[in-house]
């Protein structure tokens, strides 16, 4: 653990968000001086961070942790949708940090689940959380992020993955037909093919093929709107399938990670239709695991509703080092 304050950052494909962690009360971190920068205006991570530090005044923080939307390979970190690539050792040396670390964005979200407050969560499925049990997190957005979290003594260790790219698994005859239709158009059909913002459109088009209908030129928001207001049966059936696929995958991840500490949902898609989602077949599909249904029966599922979850994860990671 390092003396406060220290810097945390959440770097996406567009925005570079920074905050100063000034203390902690219980599991809740004090986040101050939050700034949102346009990442494309800076040639490097270091330039954006220096800009942020220049606005702080006072003594420069001695530690930082950055969550990025991109892969981390040893010392090298690379953004997926922003032209930034950097050496972690070089960042630490340039700013004279006593400690610097980089986490994958979903790794940071996973670590955050150990510190989120009750009012940061929306219950989707009731259950009993093992406070030291493994956790699983997934989130449909532009893509589908997946990660796990394991307890090691007094520390929490993120388990990054590319779980969004596993093969999608059907549970009904209709889903078999929908997957076949998607394979004809896309070839390989992964979980992300359907369970993401763009995936909602792919699912809609595949279902239209199965139903013998001509799909409209819809965006994800059009599909959710047509389902929510009841004006489009194909949109409603699409959204129902979307929720079912998420339920099956979430249950699979609960088994894969042994997630007795809970399953957490994130991303920008689900909050757009949270009431619909809660009344869908999500819980039913989560729980239908054959001879292992008893294993997932009491695992809770929560949707993360806190805007600064990645900050919390980065702060919690530094706090336990």
From Swiss-Prot:
<dbReference type="GO" id="GO:0006096">
    <property type="term" value="P:glycolytic process"/>
</dbReference>
<keyword id="KW-0547">Nucleotide-binding</keyword>
<keyword id="KW-0067">ATP-binding</keyword>
<dbReference type="GO" id="GO:0005524">
    <property type="term" value="F:ATP binding"/>
</dbReference>
<dbReference type="InterPro" id="IPR043129">
    <property type="entry name" value="ATPase_NBD"/>
</dbReference>
<feature type="binding site">
    <location>
        <begin position="9"/>
        <end position="14"/>
    </location>
    <ligand>
        <name>ATP</name>
    </ligand>
</feature>
<dbReference type="InterPro" id="IPR050201">
    <property type="entry name" value="Bacterial_glucokinase"/>
</dbReference>
<dbReference type="GO" id="GO:0005829">
    <property type="term" value="C:cytosol"/>
</dbReference>
<keyword id="KW-0963">Cytoplasm</keyword>
<keyword id="KW-0418">Kinase</keyword>
<protein>
    <recommendedName>
        <fullName>Glucokinase</fullName>
        <ecNumber>2.7.1.2</ecNumber>
    </recommendedName>
</protein>
<dbReference type="Pfam" id="PF02685">
    <property type="entry name" value="Glucokinase"/>
</dbReference>
<comment type="similarity">
    <text>Belongs to the bacterial glucokinase family.</text>
</comment>
<keyword id="KW-0324">Glycolysis</keyword>
<dbReference type="InterPro" id="IPR003836">
    <property type="entry name" value="Glucokinase"/>
</dbReference>
<dbReference type="GO" id="GO:0005536">
    <property type="term" value="F:D-glucose binding"/>
</dbReference>
<keyword id="KW-0808">Transferase</keyword>
<dbReference type="GO" id="GO:0004340">
    <property type="term" value="F:glucokinase activity"/>
</dbReference>
